[in-house]
Regions:
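Non-catalytic, surface beta->alpha helical segment in thiol-disulfide oxidoreductase systems
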Residues: 52-77
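Thiol-based oxidoreductase modules, predominantly thioredoxin-like and allied folds used
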Residues: 6-9, 25-39, 44-47
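Local sequence-structure signature of Cys/Sec-based thiol-disulfide redox active-site neighborhoods
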Residues: 1-26
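Short alpha-helical
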Residues: 14-15, 35, 67
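Intrinsic disorder/low-complexity segments
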Residues: 11, 48, 62-64
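Short, glycine/charged-enriched secondary-structure capping and boundary segments
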Residues: 20-23, 45, 65-67
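Long, low-complexity, intrinsically disordered polar/charged segments
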Residues: 17, 29-30, 74
C-alpha cells in the first residue's frame, strides 16, 4: 500500500522560535514514493512545509530526504 502524508504550511516566529498557524496546503496528501523535497521547498513562500507523522507529531519537511522520511514513518509504527 502506498504511504501518504498530510502536508501543512506553518508560520515560524523567529522571536519565540515556535511554529504558529498551521494550514493544510496544496500538497495536502503527498505520496512518499513521489516525495520531492526540492519541489516542496521551492514552492514555499513565507510559510514552511511541515509533515504530520502517524504519531500526530508535526515536523519541518522541506529539506527532508525521502530516505529520512521513510525512517521516521517506520519509527512511529
Amino acid at each position: 500500500m502506498e504511504k501518504k502524508l498530510k502536508m501543512y504550511t506553518a508560520s515560524f516566529c523567529p522571536k519565540c522560535r515556535q511554529f504558529h498557524a498551521w494550514f493544510p496546503n496544496e500538497f495536502e496528501y503527498v505520496s512518499v514514493d513521489n516525495w520531492d523535497s526540492e519541489k516542496i521547498e521551492s514552492e514555499r513562500i513565507t510559510a514552511l512545509p511541515m509533515v504530520e507523522l502517524p504519531s500526530g507529531k508535526k515536523m519541518y519537511a522541506g529539506a527532508m530526504s525521502k530516505k529520512r522520511l521513510e525512517e521516521l514513518l517506520n519509527e512511529y509504527r
